[in-house]
Amino acid sequence: ENHEFVEWEGGENRKVDISKMRDGEVVVLDNGTLRVAEKTWKAAGVAVPVFSLRSEHSYGVGDFGDLARFADWMALAGMKILQILPVNDTTMQHNWQDSYPYNIISVFALHPQYLDLEQVGELKDKALMTSFSRRRAELNSLDYTDYEAVERVKDEYMRIKYEEVKDKLDKDDNFRTFIADNKTWLLPYTAFCLLREANRTARFADWGENAVYDYRKAEELWNCEDARYISFIQYHLHTQLKRAAEHAAEKGIAIMGDMPIGVSRDSAEAWANPAIF
């Protein structure tokens, strides 16, 4: 448009043999596509599991709060991409064998270990908070992640917090919206978790009459207090991961998450939707 030189075409010079052409002949030649370098976007980044981002704010394992804090460091370093391993729930046996992040029990549910308890809020009982602060220091002092201890501490904390706020949840618009928007997967997931605990195994083939998913039974379980607690956990996880992703975006950081190829054979999806597995 401005009659300015833009770019030379790449590759060898294009050649046409006209030595045998006669007067009046015209050669129509198609040499394929224009050979110019792609204008691809490139950026530096870091690949790191969330569980490795442990900080003084953690309870023995990296959490979604640490994920947001790590984005701050990346922005200072001029990096743009933060790749993490899957953060889906993998709970089957409640021990270290559940730690493999690709053996997920739900496509949608997030792992309770990634809860940032600071964001959940302090407990009303100051003596309990002092006790949890001591246990946090003990977990953070380890040079490894004590998987079982982390799970116990976070579950204890969240159950106490749930008891504090459960009577107010029906008036919490954000919680109600989360439940309404996600009940399609929360219903089978909460039922799966409850039956896993009742049968002491995630292998649903061993659940007797519950080995085959029954929507009506899942609806019955949905109304119990333990199912609501599980949804409460997922609500906080969803909120915290969303907040971390938005914070990273504000810093110019894109979070790229690994996704498992499939789900565990003993998963909520495989149980509730056997026809597609």
Predicted regions and their residues:
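Alpha-glucan (starch/glycogen) binding determinants
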Residues: 1-30, 73, 96-99
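Conserved active-site neighborhood of enzyme catalytic/cofactor-binding cores
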Residues: 277
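Acidic/aromatic-lined carbohydrate-recognition and catalytic surfaces
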Residues: 38-274
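Basic K/R-rich, polyanion-interacting modules in nucleoproteins and related proteins
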Residues: 27-39
